Amino acid sequence: SSSAASDVYKRQPIMLIAALCIKLYDHGPVFFKQKRLTIGGKEFYVYKFRSMIVDAEKDGVARLATKNDSRITPVGKVIRATRIDELPQLLNIFKGDMSVVGPRPERPEIAKEYEESIPEFAYRLKVKAGLTGYAQIYGKYNTTAYDKLKLDLMYIESYSILEDLKLILATFKIVFTKES
């Protein structure tokens, strides 16, 4: 969409600074891509600025990041705290893999684990994955997968353009205030 292209253009200085900081810190790759799921279980690569050490999962085991994860670099801590690490996902929105609002895209192997213990988890794939949503606005970093799922399902049940606009505004408020 043209608004996603416009957002990428407006954020170029921030993205350039983030890219330089990541590269200067450890000379590793600036971007990180990872297979995720969107509507209908379709796989796609999500793009982010790399916030962890190179080869953070070299053992091949998929692990969710924790609050004080030792794999997160000092630059990574800053770009995660400010949500700058998510900006490359504007490209995913532009490509049509994601929408601005919707459940966060999950990794296939982690989604499979969740579906085994929470069968309703698959319901999240009825809509396109998003950059922000109820779980990001009303949940906290340490919210359980089940609680995030309940928030995602609330979003799916109450979807509307007006609701999406409210969530986008709430996201900006969170990103640009200290309480987040």
Regions inferred by a protein language model and the residue ranges of each:
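Residue-level signal for short amphipathic helical patches enriched in basic/charged
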Residues: 12, 82-85, 101, 140, ...
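A hydrophobic, helix-centered structural microdomain
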Residues: 6-55, 92, 161, 166-180
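C-terminal terminal-structure detector
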Residues: 120-180
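Short hydrophobic/aromatic residue motifs in ordered secondary structure
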Residues: 14-16, 86, 133
